[in-house]
Design a protein with these regions (language model features):
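C-terminal ends of transmembrane helices
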Residues: 4, 54-66, 109-123, 179-190, ...
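Flexible hinge motifs at transmembrane-helix junctions and intramembrane kinks/re-entrant loops
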Residues: 40-43, 166, 179-253, 273-288, ...
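Early transmembrane hairpin of solute transport permeases
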Residues: 15-174, 362-366, 372, 376, ...
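Interfacial segments of multi-pass membrane proteins
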Residues: 81-87, 185, 335-350, 356-361
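Hydrophobic, small-residue-rich membrane helices and short re-entrant helix-turn-helix hairpins
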Residues: 187-202, 253-275, 288-312
């Protein structure tokens, strides 16, 4: 792929801010939603802070050669729920989040040591292109239902948690967003091609705003796409105050400190069982993601800086991120898709996004704005991002002879099992 900005290229400062914002918008919704799913008072702002810090740790370990952002991992949602379920208090549950993330991170550290000692040839034999290709495709295709579901859902919910706006109106906003991204990426001039998602989200948000304003004026719920109520957090007793614009996130370690006196060997064992098996599953995704980004930037990241460094960056980054936000981190397909579609692989954009995530986590207005972006707008964006991830995986199969039964069965089994959602549960762990 011909890149506009290579990994080590540094855009001008003004452009860098916009490119970093684009990366941030691409990953932010998913990063913020994991704490919401877990509940128990977890802070989305703290998770965003943890993702930013974790990404910087990852960049340091990979010598700033791998342009990908780390965000909250959905794979550990069951593990995180088990941490709270097994804790006798909220403080112990929060401490469990950190200990569990350390267990998961140590899996990566151990594998990294093995890779450093014996090399990566065994990885290539264990996971050749005929395995990696469909695995990458499954990562994108398994997210397809999320994108299409979001595309017909608005941001304003009723008491039952259902979207109040018409699915057709939401779909119009999603299509406006998607078409804007496609037009900018395909026909736009240089700058437009570099920031199609910023422009697309802006166009979709504007469309949703128009519908919502009309809906509010005419009192028609079917047109109310955006939930402007999230901006009420900027008011303190009906007045604007400095404290409503700046707030320190509720970091996980602050609550976790009170859990040490309740810690028991049995609970630690529960955490080990909940987190360690999932870490091995996410390890396969780690390989697939780095094979994918390697193909995009035309540089083998498993050799330079090396798989041991990417694993250490991901593992230690997850540990550090969980200390602040409670969520183990992982390389984000949305970030990789953003790099590929915009052809901007500058690692400085990733660094800028990480720093931006840290700063923004303290700024209530920006967090409120991101929370106000309706699902349909992000659904339009994700249709492009997830689709590109799937296509990237299929492209890896271009040199594979699918006329050979051995290859055909490997690819078909992975695709059907992955897209079909095959899963095995052990207690509360899936």
């Amino acid at each position: 792929m011909k890149l506009i900005y290579g990994v080590k290229d540094k855009p001008k400062f003004g452009q860098l801010i916009i490119f970093s914002l684009q990366q941030l918008l691409a990953i932010m919704t998913a990063t913020l939603v994991v704490p919401v799913i877990i509940g128990n008072g977890m802070s989305s702002a703290a998770a965003l802070f943890g993702a930013g810090v974790g990404t910087i740790v990852y960049l340091l370990f990979t010598l700033f050669r791998s342009p990908v952002f780390l965000g909250s991992s959905f794979a550990f949602i069951g593990s995180m729920s088990a941490a709270f379920a097994g804790g006798v208090s909220m403080s112990l549950g929060y401490l469990g989040l950190i200990i569990g993330a350390v267990f998961a991170g140590l899996v990566y550290v151990v594998i990294a040591i093995v890779v450093k000692l014996v090399g990566v040839k065994w990885i290539n034999k264990l996971m050749p292109p005929v395995v990696i290709g469909p695995t990458v495709a499954v990562i994108g295709l398994s997210l397809a239902s999320n994108a299409t579901g979001d595309a017909v859902s608005g941001g304003l919910k009723n008491a039952a948690g259902a979207s109040v706006c018409s699915p057709l109106i939401a779909l119009i906003c999603a299509i406006v967003t998607l078409l804007t991204v496609i037009i900018c990426s395909t026909y736009g001039k240089k700058m437009a091609k570099l920031i199609p998602f910023v422009i697309g989200i802006g166009a979709g948000y504007l469309c949703a705003t128009v519908f919502t304003v009309i809906g509010n004026l005419a009192d028609v719920d079917a047109l109310k796409v955006i939930n402007f109520g999230v901006f009420s957090s900027l008011l303190d007793n009906g007045k604007v105050a400095l404290s409503t614009f700046f707030a320190v996130p509720d970091f996980t370690f602050l609550t976790a400190l009170g859990g040490f006196k309740e810690l028991s060997p049995a609970y630690i064992g529960t955490l080990a069982v909940a987190y360690i098996p999932v870490a091995f599953v996410v390890f396969a995704e780690h390989i697939a993601d780095h094979e994918n980004i390697s193909a995009i930037i035309e540089a083998n990241l498993l050799e330079n800086p090396g798989l041991h460094r990417t694993l250490l960056g991901d593992g230690v980054g997850s540990m550090v991120g969980a200390i602040f936000g409670g969520c183990p981190n992982t390389t984000y397909g949305e970030s990789i898709g953003c790099v590929a579609i915009t052809r901007n692989a500058s690692v400085y954009s990733i660094l800028g996004a990480a720093i931006g995530a840290i700063i923004i986590s303290f700024l209530t207005p920006f967090v409120a704005f991101v929370n106000s972006i309706p699902s349909c707008v992000m659904g339009g964006v994700c249709m492009a991002l997830y689709g590109f991830i799937a296509v990237s995986g299929l492209k890896m199969l271009s040199g594979i002879d699918l006329g050979e039964n051995r290859n055909l069965f490997v690819v078909s089994t992975i695709l059907v099992a992955g897209i079909g959602g095959l899963s095995v549960s052990f207690g509360k762990i899936t």
